[in-house]
């Protein structure tokens, strides 16, 4: 019997087009890492998979398969098949996979076929697609030349990147804006999910007519998400563009990012009172996170300024009091640190300019 399966040559098309994929692995496998367009509808739950795995090691494949059938039968089996049918009714162009494209994929496909749907499974499964994505990341610097966008904190690098077809937003993929204040409300993805999402973004970028791969100047870690070593090494040798901005514009931008957006986000999630408390805690923790590098005296001064600014914000509904501590943080911490880092990249700098000049330079090159 010929199996209805999708060959490895189709991986790129599936991932670039965000084809819906049903992941038939157990939840514990899915949580460790999956693909951006995948949804978990397991053949076996975690405990069932564990029992079958133990049986396989001790008694072999045939006995393990029998155990699997005995664990997933009757009403349990029907509930799972119904969930699969619902997924593929909503996503008729979807595919399914398990870990290696083996027995779990074939059994899931068979049960779906018995229920009236013939759905292709992905050859090689999660493991082979994951390897394809790892190779995509490792080879990225050889497909299109990298350009690194640097710029002092608050210069608007992210805003700029989001306007350019050449760009891949690493911080957006990591769900973390690159500073002590860079947390997203929803938290960061697992390391594997970060890498998978990065690889898919790179595949999509490669399908554009952009001449370069434009990336923000990042350290090895973006929050807790680590850039893959080969990719990071490529960034370390790439040419650099420096985005320049006035202090006033930087302060306005950071007031919006650190205060307005974060305050609003916490209130939306937690309500007025608890949201404000969480927002105040976020500011305090962000300063505490860099206490060693600030020094105790500078840290205490900033915390006092934040407390005063929060008090004014509460009593007068005025956020401008935050500008003082933001400016001090820039002048005493971020700006000297940036200057030290950019000095080390001096020989790699291709161009410096404000937003308008930078757009023009990229349009011309």
UniProtKB/Swiss-Prot annotation:
The keyword Transferase applies. It catalyses: 5-methylaminomethyl-2-thiouridine(34) in tRNA + selenophosphate + (2E)-geranyl diphosphate + H2O + H(+) = 5-methylaminomethyl-2-selenouridine(34) in tRNA + (2E)-thiogeraniol + phosphate + diphosphate; 5-methylaminomethyl-2-thiouridine(34) in tRNA + (2E)-geranyl diphosphate = 5-methylaminomethyl-S-(2E)-geranyl-thiouridine(34) in tRNA + diphosphate; 5-methylaminomethyl-S-(2E)-geranyl-thiouridine(34) in tRNA + selenophosphate + H(+) = 5-methylaminomethyl-2-(Se-phospho)selenouridine(34) in tRNA + (2E)-thiogeraniol; 5-methylaminomethyl-2-(Se-phospho)selenouridine(34) in tRNA + H2O = 5-methylaminomethyl-2-selenouridine(34) in tRNA + phosphate. Monomer. PANTHER family: TRNA 2-SELENOURIDINE SYNTHASE. It comes from Shewanella pealeana (strain ATCC 700345 / ANG-SQ1). GO terms for molecular function: transferase activity, transferring alkyl or aryl (other than methyl) groups; tRNA 2-selenouridine synthase activity. Residues 15-138 form the Rhodanese domain. It comes from the Bacteria. Disulfide bonds: none annotated. Keywords: Selenium, Transferase. It is an enzyme of class 2 (transferase). This is tRNA 2-selenouridine synthase. NCBIfam families: PRK11784.1-2 (NF008750), PRK11784.1-3 (NF008751), tRNA_sel_U_synt (TIGR03167). Belongs to the SelU family. InterPro entries: Rhodanese-like_dom, Rhodanese-like_dom_sf, SelU. Its EC number is 2.9.1.3. The gene is selU. GO terms for biological process: tRNA wobble uridine modification.
